[in-house]
């Protein structure tokens, strides 16, 4: 799972 903010 990858989140970039």
UniProtKB/Swiss-Prot annotation:
* Protein name per its UniProtKB record: Unknown protein from spot 474 of 2D-PAGE of etiolated coleoptile
Remarks, miscellaneous:
On the 2D-gel the determined pI of this unknown protein is: 6.1, its MW is: 30.4 kDa.
Superkingdom assignment: Eukaryota
